[in-house]
């Protein structure tokens, strides 16, 4: 049964169905597979269940969590076919795919002349290739022909070099072969292997049939084509499926989903006959989702449009409004500042100013690399020095900042200490035998006595005792000392980082406040160490990946702990919509920025044409681009306004870079306020 509404999905209704099925199964809730669109919903659903009504652990999972567990449990069913060398798959960290593919692009580009007519950097090409792979996996289309498909939809394909698109597919093949060889999986490979390999095995389908009697899906609009294949298997096995959803605001572009294909499957049921898809021409499709007329009832929720000439003036307007709201303690916890994606500078300026003005906030935005945080970068530098990694270079400024933090001194003094001790500090890249001598000489004691003290197996190494036994210990010896001792103990890089944090950084002025970001660096390092042990990367590459590719992320528990009724929320439109937030006061920042509604077709990337519902080799025209952008803008506005009580918009005539700032977003807002057709 599929229940598709044109209103917000009622979580209570879905939970009631779940409770009803639990009663039917006499509390055996493990027989019910409940797939939710977001992990944040799991706790809400569990809290709605009568704890006395079930006798087993509820199987409430996201689709990704479910397939990851299934792959780990049933890996042996597909490992022989894949010629995998290990019995259990290794999940690689999110930072690794971009690094591996960028390295491949660099190699193929300069060694074999690949991507000759592509103007982007190797890193940008890598992002496009990985985006194509991810989209194809979600769309359940051939992951090895994404470049070819995109090429044939280009309006100017006759003037393009086809090889640049087939080379996209070669890189994907090279990348996936490398992962499979090492029994490693990332997100798109997990989706692909589960859907194309494991789910098609008769033995696995029998296992599913034995374990589950029901399937519940809470959100059809956030269901991928790959997830639909699981639904089809349940239907084929004669199991009951219950699918709920809301197609009033089509935001599937955010999720790489294909609502056309999903609705077409369910439209075969009688109650959905009216949704039967007929016209597959993108330029004409407006079958569901919000129309402009659906926005009109919300127009009175936009209370004021602040327009300034300069970018800095716009920021001041945002801060002025934030201060005004913050005066009312009841309002601040109901307020969200929503900024377009990729606005790191705007985010930094707003958060910096809020902090100075004493306004509490929490941010869900993770545009920053981990290394952009001072304490995190300090740990990365220390880890590289500990590993003796000569393959990575840090700037003088980074060393000075590290010394300034550890010693609690200003940068002028830190610079002086660095200049005086640069050789000693950088000597950590030397072999242990050479470091032994430098370390001993710096304390004016004999090498033999010192080494004997360190290597005495019958006594526990006590850093304080060592410090007390040496005269004239230099401030920087604290760093060198821990590196030396860590090496003698043969500690892993991540374990050394953990000890350095707990023994040194946590004692510093802001040490405790930086626990979370330091934990993230250490956790990321542990995952990269596992990847190195599998042979996916070399050990010396760990430091480079940590510095250049590892991104900040916000865990659900961390976000929950940071939220509060006394804090402003700073977020992006897509995160806000997906978070089911109930903040009725919204401040839309930088509405002249086109990232509110970004370009769909890029040089070698276009997720739309990778959809199953997109006709093969159909040219993606400028008209398609404009109509879809307008379509998604209407749906974005609908989804934001639907949860709003008061909206304040902010725009500057000139962008951060000094260009005239105009966007479809702002035009839509003005027309909506004037109730004009757009």
Give the residues covered by each predicted segment:
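C-terminal accessory regions
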Residues: 589-670
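Conserved P-loop NTPase-based nucleic-acid remodeling module centered on helicase motor cores
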Residues: 29-137
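ATPase/helicase motor core of nucleic-acid motors
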Residues: 329-481
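Accessory C-terminal helicase-associated subdomains
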Residues: 440-573, 580-582, 645
């Amino acid at each position: 049964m599929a229940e598709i509404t044109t209103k917000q999905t009622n979580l209570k209704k879905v939970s009631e169905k779940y409770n009803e099925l639990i009663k039917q199964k006499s509390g055996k809730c493990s027989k019910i597979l409940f797939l939710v669109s977001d992990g944040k919903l799991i706790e809400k659903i569990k809290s709605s269940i009568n704890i006395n009504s079930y006798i087993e652990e509820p199987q409430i999972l996201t689709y990704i969590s479910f397939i990851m567990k299934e792959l780990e449990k049933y890996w042996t069913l597909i490992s022989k076919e894949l010629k995998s060398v290990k019995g259990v798959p290794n999940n690689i960290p999110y930072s690794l795919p971009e690094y591996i593919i960028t390295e491949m692009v660099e190699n193929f580009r300069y060694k074999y002349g690949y991507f000759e007519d592509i103007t982007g950097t190797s890193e940008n090409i890598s992002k496009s290739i990985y985006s194509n792979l991810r989209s194809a996996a979600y769309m359940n289309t051939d992951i090895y022909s994404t470049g070819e498909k995109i090429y044939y939809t280009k309006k100017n394909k006759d003037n393009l070099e086809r090889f640049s698109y087939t080379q996209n597919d070669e890189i994907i093949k090279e990348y996936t072969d490398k992962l499979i060889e090492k029994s490693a999986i990332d997100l798109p490979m997990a989706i692909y292997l589960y859907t194309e390999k494991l789910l098609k095995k008769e033995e696995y389908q029998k296992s599913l049939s034995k374990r589950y009697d029901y399937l519940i899906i809470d959100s059809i609009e956030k269901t991928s084509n790959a997830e639909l294949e699981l639904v089809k298997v349940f239907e084929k096995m004669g199991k009951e499926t219950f699918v709920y959803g809301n197609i009033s605001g089509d935001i599937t572009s955010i999720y790489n989903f294909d609502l056309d294909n999903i609705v077409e499957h369910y439209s075969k049921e009688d109650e959905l006959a009216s949704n039967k898809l007929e016209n597959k021409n993108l330029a004409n499709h407006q079958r569901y989702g919000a129309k402009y007329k659906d926005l009109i009832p919300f127009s009175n929720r936009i209370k004021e449009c602040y327009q300034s000439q300069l970018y800095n003036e716009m920021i001041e307007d945002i801060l002025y409004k934030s201060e005004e709201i913050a005066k009312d303690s009841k309002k601040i916890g109901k307020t969200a500042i929503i900024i377009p994606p990729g606005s790191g500078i705007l985010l930094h300026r707003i958060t910096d100013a809020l902090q100075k003005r004493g306004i509490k906030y929490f941010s869900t935005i993770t545009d920053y690399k981990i290394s952009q945080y001072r304490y995190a970068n300090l740990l990365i530098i220390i880890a590289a020095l500990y590993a003796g990694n000569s393959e990575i270079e840090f700037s003088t400024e980074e060393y000075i900042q590290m010394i300034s933090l550890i010693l609690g001194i200003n940068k002028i003094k830190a610079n002086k200490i660095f200049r005086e001790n640069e050789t000693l500090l950088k000597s950590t890249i030397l072999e242990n035998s050479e470091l032994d001598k430098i370390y001993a000489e710096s304390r004016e004691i004999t090498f033999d006595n010192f080494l004997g003290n360190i290597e005495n197996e019958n006594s526990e190494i006590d850093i304080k005792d060592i410090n007390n036994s040496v005269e004239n210990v230099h401030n920087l010896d604290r760093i060198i000392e821990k590196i030396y001792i860590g090496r003698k103990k043969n500690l892993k890089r991540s374990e050394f980082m953990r000890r350095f944090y707990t023994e040194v950084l946590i004692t510093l002025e802001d040490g405790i406040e930086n626990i979370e970001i330091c934990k993230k660096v250490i956790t990321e390092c542990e995952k990269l160490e596992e990847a190195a042990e599998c042979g996916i990367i070399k050990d010396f590459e760990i430091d480079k990946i940590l510095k250049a590719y590892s991104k900040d992320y916000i865990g659900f528990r961390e976000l929950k702990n940071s939220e509060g009724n006394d804090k402003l929320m700073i977020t992006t439109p897509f995160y806000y919509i997906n978070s089911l937030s109930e903040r009725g006061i919204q401040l839309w920042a930088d509405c002249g920025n086109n990232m509110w509604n970004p370009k769909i077709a890029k040089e070698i990337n276009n997720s739309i044409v990778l959809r199953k519902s997109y006709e093969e080799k159909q040219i993606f025209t400028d008209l398609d681009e404009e109509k879809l952008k307008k379509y998604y803008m209407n749906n974005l506005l609908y989804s934001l306004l639907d949860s709003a009580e008061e909206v304040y918009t902010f725009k500057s005539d000139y962008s951060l870079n000094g260009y005239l700032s105009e966007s479809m977003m702002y035009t839509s807002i003005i027309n909506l306020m004037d109730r004009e057709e757009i």
